Amino acid sequence: MPQDIFSYYRRMRSVGPVSFNRDSGAWDVFDYADVHFILMHNEIFSSDPSYSGRMADGRRGTGASFITMDNPDHKDLRNISAPFFLPSSIEKYSEHIEKISSDLISKLEPGQDFISGYAVGLPVNVISDLLGVPESEREMFKAWSDYIIGNRRDDGFDKINRYMYAKMSEIFSHKDGDDIMSVINRGLFHSTPLTVEQKIGYVMLLIIGGNETTTNLLGNMVRALSENPGIQELVREDKGYYRNFIEETLRYYSPIQFLPHRFAAQDYVLNGKQIRKGDRISIWLGSANRDEGQFDNPEEFMIDRRKNNHLAFGMGVHMCLGAPLARLEAEIGLKDILEKFPRINVNREKSKMLDNPMVYGFSELYMD
């Protein structure tokens, strides 16, 4: 992946909006219209890897993760936890999230890494509280998530995976309340109780989705404030700009840059390219969100953008379940960040970007 990914996206939208990548063995899709079409048409572009001859767990449609399923299986499994992530449900957590954010920001020292000092802790503690994860286990849960996001499979992963399997099995053995973990514990799939593997896979997905995106969003918000001092002043003066600012950050610096696993369920011609049944497709959200055909002045960060139907959280049946929670965390975080730092100026020489083409954000972020 080129260092300047946004110039690369711009070139690919111009010369090859739908291109076959010989290195990855997949079709790369870069323009908004085609990415949106794929997200909205699961009957053509499936999330089920069995269309490519791969199996999530050896049998089609029975994998532990609903992100590798299509409806009705996807809906059946997703709906187990979906009520907890509705905007009306998430709003009830506001006061608790404010407390977590306030505690973290008060401990953040001048010159300290913003990512490890705040941006990691906020979403990890929020999702852990929602799931009922003991405080003593949260660091391990985060490490587990990092291994999976980074697609690292080594002795360290094997060790932590065995530990987490045993720990999760233990937690599920006595979960019978009204919290998310208890509801998953009692969950049914095709009227059959979930297996231990399915329960663990479900929780793993919620942990990953509940921390990585928000951590990167928080860091990218700080970057956007630093790069746009005029906008920083507007946001400081008027909280009415908060939501517009967050949505523009999601568009401009999308935390998830691409989704690598869609599979053609049938032969289909996409933007003049013949896609064959079983072909794998990667959809580049970060490119779609800067498409000149969809957004006015897409390379400009505009807090007053009128038409901002970005795809940072996806679209359609697989739209990010935790999007309302991420937005609420970002809004609460933005308030506390602005109050903590009278002037936000990122030290780009000292800060470090993540080395993972799938996600966009900082591994370390320092302010002067």
Report residues per predicted region:
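Cytochrome P450
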Residues: 1-368
